[in-house]
UniProtKB/Swiss-Prot annotation:
Protein name according to UniProt: Transcription factor HES-2
Domains as described in the record: Has a particular type of basic domain (presence of a helix-interrupting proline) that binds to the N-box (CACNAG), rather than the canonical E-box (CANNTG).
Keyword Nucleus among UniProt keywords: yes
PANTHER family (alphabetical): BASIC HELIX-LOOP-HELIX TRANSCRIPTION FACTOR, HES-RELATED
Organism, as annotated: Rattus norvegicus (Rat)
Length: 157
């Protein structure tokens, strides 16, 4: 029993494309490893000319070693700067808000002034705001309950 012509053609096409796809895959891997070598060797302080013919496993091992050494140095130097960066951004945002908010007609001037004062107090306390929701510290005001109507419910029938 023979397969239909379309099924056989598809199988032949797959067989003929398989070596080509494998060649492309290997080329992508080799290109990525070459780029990785070019990125990692200078960071390790190694001369690229001295390591011109590294095996793929060597490139991967050097990369793993470099990445394992990375977290300790990144975390220790970045923490103080990130708080300064946060505060700098917060102050810049507050300054922009102080220019724009008074011209905003949506808020009453008293509310606008209270909001700006609250935000300025946050810069004095320093640091980012806590991640606890505001509803945990103060209960939200409940909406006013309308008085019961003496007319009863309106029904369309």
């Amino acid at each position: 029993m023979r397969l239909p012509r379309g099924v056989g053609d598809a199988a032949e096409l797959r067989k003929s494309l398989k070596p080509l796809l494998e060649k492309r895959r290997r080329a992508r891997i080799n290109e990525s490893l070459s780029q990785l070598k070019g990125l990692v060797l200078p960071l390790l302080g190694a001369e690229t000319s001295r390591y011109s013919k590294l095996e793929k496993a060597d490139i991967l091992e050097m990369t793993v070693r470099f990445l394992r050494e990375q977290p300790a140095s990144v975390c220790s130097t970045e923490a103080p700067g990130s708080l300064d960066s946060y505060l700098e951004g917060y102050r810049a945002c507050l300054a922009r808000l102080a220019r724009v908010l008074p011209a905003c007609s949506v808020l009453e001037p008293a509310v606008s002034a209270r909001l700006l004062e609250h935000l300025r107090q946050r810069t004095v306390s320093g640091g980012p705001p806590s991640l606890t929701p505001a509803s945990a510290s103060a209960p939200a005001p409940s909406p006013p309950v309308p008085p019961p109507s003496s007319l009863g419910l309106w029904r369309p029938w």
